[in-house]
């Protein structure tokens, strides 16, 4: 389904145009739901997580969880060029109660921190969401 959606987006986008794709990241789900909320055993026993802790289709009927390598494979299969990928929320979901307690100036500093780290590959996979900014190559590109 993901590849079909990317190919359809590519079909209706002009050459040189952009496609923005939002993803829910696998590791965020494992850390928050499976480990933090103590569903790890049932997740493994129920086949919701594979041996590498990748969420399977059984994990959720509504959402699909991906890793960076899944995103890169989809882009390659769809022959789309990445301009940039960013962590939409980074650490925010992990520290939400602390963020809610910040004053306005402190929160602005957190936003500055997030903007300075949202493209770091070493932090990307742990974000709850990513946005992949892709370009449709034209005939001359």
Regions from the language model: what does each represent?
Residues 40-63:
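C-terminal alpha-helical "lid/dimerization" subdomain adjacent to the S-adenosyl-L-methionine
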Residues 20-23, 81-87:
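A structural signal for short, well-ordered beta-strand segments and their strand-loop junctions
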Residues 3-5, 34-37, 100:
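Short, glycine/charged-enriched secondary-structure capping and boundary segments
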Residues 84-141:
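A C-terminal cap/extension of S-adenosyl-L-methionine-dependent methyltransferases
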Residues 1, 28-32, 91-95:
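Short catalytic/ligand-binding loop motif for oxyanion handling, primarily in non-cytosolic enzymes
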Residues 18-48:
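Conserved class I S-adenosyl-L-methionine
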Residues 3-18:
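A short glycine-rich, Lys/Arg-flanked "PGG" loop and its adjoining helix->strand segment in the class I
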Residues 60-79, 85:
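Short alpha-helix
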């Amino acid at each position: 389904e993901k590849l079909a959606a990317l190919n359809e987006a590519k079909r209706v986008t002009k050459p040189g145009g952009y496609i923005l794709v939002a993803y829910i990241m696998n590791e965020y789900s494992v850390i928050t739901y499976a480990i933090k909320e103590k569903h790890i055993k049932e997740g493994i026993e129920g086949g919701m997580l594979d041996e590498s802790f990748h969420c399977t289709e059984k994990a959720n009927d509504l959402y699909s969880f991906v890793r960076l390598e899944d995103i890169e494979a989809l882009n390659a299969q769809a022959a789309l060029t990445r301009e940039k990928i960013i962590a939409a929320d980074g650490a925010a979901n992990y520290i939400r109660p602390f963020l809610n307690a910040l004053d306005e100036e402190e929160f602005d500093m957190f936003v500055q921190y997030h903007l300075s780290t949202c493209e770091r590959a070493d932090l990307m996979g742990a974000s709850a969401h990513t946005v992949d900014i892709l370009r449709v190559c034209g005939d001359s590109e």
